[in-house]
Amino acid sequence: MMASTARRRMARDHLQNRPKRIGEDVIFTNNNRKREFFTRGEPRGTYDYSRYRSTKSDTSVVWLLIGANAMVYLAWQEPENFRTMRTHFLVSESALANGYWHTALTAAFSHNSFNHLFGNMFTLYFFGRDVALACGGAYLLNLYLVGGVVASLAHVGYERYERRKRRPHVGFFDKREHDSFFSWFDERMDKIARLAAPASLGASGAVNAIIAMSVLMMPHRKIYLYGILPLESWVFGAIFLLRDYIGLGTNDGVGHSAHLGGAATGALAFLLRNGRMMR
């Protein structure tokens, strides 16, 4: 009797700790419901995370981020807040030069247009749940924050590069460095150009980091572009990367460099996490 009970216990523990396959992705579970996620081979199809949806603390981070973005959006709608919002929730080269480094993060929660907010939060909800269920809520939060900061810095860095390219540092007045007037004039012109550089706001860069992570985890999952066109997720990701690359240097009002910076953050996060798990 005791031997039979011991065998049943061993069989139960073996089943609880062996990997459970969904498509060709592997999710390891244990008695504490902690899990690790990584891909082996090429995953296929749609993934069923329903067994983990009772872990509300993970997916609740998605709602926390949506709520924070909504609160900042509402703050933008009050006219008396306009000066404060422009100072503390827009990131630009001028803002960073004046010591407002926190704007690299706060801009990732900032939307003054409902359509902009809705588009980013709609995307965050669907892709953010994937990452939260696979990697945990804390991981999703960190990825959003880091992706947002990197996206802001990518925007500022690219705008600075474009400004310097249009007006090289070595110019007519630089040949007269001995003349204080020309040096002063160059400094003033540089400051004016810095102030005129476009500021950035929005969660797009942070959301792109999450999209990149999700796409790389599940590259063959079906995604319906605009709810109509079925695409494998890697094709979906490639289309948007190409769109942002082509859009660099255009004046279409879209922060393409920020999008690419966010996507690069998500790709690096995937490589670091996947490499650690495969060891």
Task: Report residues per predicted region.
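A detector for small-residue-rich transmembrane helices and their helix-helix packing motifs
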Residues: 5-279
